[in-house]
């Protein structure tokens, strides 16, 4: 297709026609192409108000689909294609990132109970992915592939936990997040976030558990 001729035709189209073409083009793209074309635009956009019950429902559906293997797309790997990442894997991370971002917005709206419910579902799923369950497929994959800033997601999650959980409940949820952070050189500073958002009672219970279980909270380097 001749590029110059195409753009001359496009310049003569109405806004409605261009939007219709853009809509069609979006659905012809794969996940990576959409991120490349529209990613910067989405980062600049203001987040829309999230409907908490819808986010929870979407998170539950995404969890069930993932467990059922909807996004698991294995292929015969060899020396030529080992770096290939299936579209299903790309789509899974994109959907996960969208739901984490939406849950963060729910937390910012001070709907902390609903935010916690969604975050708990998503982080259970992340744990299963990191443990190697057959949810997605690639030679190498991990949480670094989640779009967005995970520290922001965790900040929202932990702040909501602090608002709705007892000291014992708070500690029970935060401890696995602390251990997970230690595996990634404390890149998300989970302990600092947990102390920042906790009440005195929550902080005391958490610190006692950290000491008892001898959990590292910062890098020694």
Segments from the language model and where they lie:
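Eukaryote-biased, non-catalytic alpha-solenoid scaffold regions
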Residues: 4-8, 16, 23, 27-221
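Residue-level signal for short amphipathic helical patches enriched in basic/charged
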Residues: 13
């Amino acid at each position: 297709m001749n590029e110059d001729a195409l753009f001359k035709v496009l310049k003569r189209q109405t806004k409605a026609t261009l939007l219709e073409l853009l809509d069609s083009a979006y659905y012809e793209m794969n996940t990576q192409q959409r991120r490349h074309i529209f990613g910067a635009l989405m980062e600049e956009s203001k987040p829309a108000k999230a409907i908490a019950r819808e986010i929870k429902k979407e998170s539950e559906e995404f969890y069930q689909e993932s467990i059922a293997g909807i996004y698991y797309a294995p292929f015969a790997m060899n020396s030529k294609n080992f770096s290939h990442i299936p579209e299903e894997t790309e789509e899974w991370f994109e959907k996960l990132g969208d739901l984490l971002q939406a849950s963060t917005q729910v937390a910012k709206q001070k709907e902390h109970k609903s935010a916690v419910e969604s975050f708990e579902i998503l982080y259970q799923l992340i744990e299963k992915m990191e443990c190697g369950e057959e949810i997605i497929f690639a030679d190498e994959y991990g949480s670094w592939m989640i779009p967005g800033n995970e520290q922001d997601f965790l900040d929202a999650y932990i702040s909501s936990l602090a608002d709705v959980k007892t000291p014992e409940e708070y500690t029970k949820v935060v401890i696995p997040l602390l251990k997970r952070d230690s595996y990634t050189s404390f890149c998300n500073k989970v302990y600092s976030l947990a102390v920042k958002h906790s009440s005195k009672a929550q902080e005391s219970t958490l610190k006692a558990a950290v000491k008892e279980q001898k959990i590292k909270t910062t890098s020694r380097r």
